[in-house]
Amino acid sequence: MHLPRLPFSACLLAALIGCNAAAAEPPATTNAAPATDSLRTITADLRTEAGPMNRMHDFCVGAGRANEGLRADWQRQLRFVREQCGFRYIRFHGLFCDDMGVYQEDRQGQPVYNWQYIDELFDFIHGIGMKPFVELGFMPGWMASGSQTIFWWRGNVTPPKDYAKWEAFVATFVRHVTERYGSDEVKTWYFEVWNEPNLDGFWMGNPEKKSYEEWSPGARAEYFKLYAASARGVKSVDAAYRVGGPATAGEAWIEATLAFCTEQKAPLDFVTTHSYATMSGYLDETGTAGTVISPDRNAITSGVKNVRGKIERSPYAGAELHYTEWSASYTPADPIHDSYHSAAFILDKMKNIGTAATSMSYWTFTDIFEESGPRMTPFHGGFGLLNYQDLPKPSFYAYQFLNRLGDTELKSSDAASFVCRNDAGGVQALFWDFTITHPGPSVINQVFYAQDQPAKPAQTAELALSGVKKGNYRLVVTKVGYQTNDVQSAWRAMGSPAQLTKAQVATLRQACSGEPVLDEKVRIGTDGRFTRRFPMRENDVYFVELIPAQKK
């Protein structure tokens, strides 16, 4: 029993319309908004701050499983997204799976621990300036009470046959990382108990094929037993270490977890859960499910705020809330992940969630992801910000642009924008059009987003800044949208080859290079004003920078 689910792109440089305050009427453009549309104006005054820029978007990012993190290509890609997108933590499954070699027992049944693979992985993560958001799971085979597994790599999802051994195992692991990295470092980590225990695929299995209503109470009680033992194991090493959960799919069991920890006095330092913007479903173990994106513009956003409300009404008011998985879709075979639509989708959620969540960990940074085994094509709807060949998808640029925003956010008149400044005197404006173009349940994502989807015109955007310091600047404009830094469309245009030659990879890399569509000099006068218009299409994203000229 699983919860219900549905059955089964060369860069184009867009014309920019320039109109500094003293300029003449802007020239016409074939990409202008229809005459019936009003002008969309984005105004900000550099003297009017909104406050520090909220960096919850770069707090954490996800990956498939720990063993994949031992690969050179995985490590190369993580180093790149760390540098470009600023991610600070990384979370993945399978830390305790048998392919990590962490646990055996001798002939007397005594534990034999081995942390060599984990050391290799954590040393790399630590060495590039990141930290692990540790998911405690799955169950080592020697400790498992059953044989139920999940995914191609066979993660055991059964409870421990001896909870005392599990607790000692967790404590020994935490003690080991403390000795290796120091308690001050480990105090900055997070220990999350298990993954999506409200789904039978991830917890206990369901050999009797019970309905969810019949299965869930027993599974939840067993998870709370695992949670309490895990928390004791973590806290036995250092009471200041952070432990949390329930890491559920679909924001389930939040109130029950808060109540359990209150009543049983079990430690709960943070709350975790997951959300995907599909109409139904939570798990696609084989990568064959059909999905439909929710037509609700507030999908994910409203759920995050609802969970925050539950926490604030509990004894844990003010607790950190981490969404340790989120994306447009829960399946690793959904072309929306490769599509230009994803960039605006991500930015809309980051803007509107605001401070309701401490972090939103995008699932995932890479297509090197083998839950349903290795995939057979370079673009297959994988979760990643990067594909196998290190090619950035539009979703990657959403996070890169967010990372390039200055630390001081300015008040903006436009709800689909961030305007910031940095300590160097530069200004950054990030704005987008978010339009759900999917027609609804009549067609699944796997059909709709696999097809060419030209973007229709949207309102022309006018960026109007005031309070800009007089002087010379570079105006640098980077764009993502249909056929602009849109590698899926470029791949489709070359015939969607299943295997890429080196020449084809080079062509695609040029198509998603992230090079500016405009880089020119501008002069800001004594009035401190800057105005420029930008033609918009559905789901276009613009990143605009005013960079003070270097004085000679």
Predicted regions: what they are:
Residues 281-292, 307-343, 372-386:
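Active-site clefts of carbohydrate-active enzymes
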Residues 21-190, 212-250, 264-266, 312-318, ...:
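Non-catalytic accessory regions flanking glycosidase/transglycosidase catalytic cores in CAZymes
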Residues 142, 191-209, 250-252, 321-331:
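Active-site-proximal loop/short-helix segments
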Residues 7-18:
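Bacterial N-terminal signal peptides
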Residues 173, 300-310:
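Short, well-ordered amphipathic alpha-helical segments that serve as non-catalytic structural scaffolds
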Residues 1-5:
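N-terminal secretory signal peptides that target proteins for export/translocation
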Residues 98-102, 141-150, 198-204, 278-285, ...:
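Short acidic/His/Gly/Ser-rich catalytic and metal-binding motifs that mark active-site loops
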Residues 170, 187-189, 195, 241, ...:
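Aromatic- and acid-rich polysaccharide-binding/catalytic face
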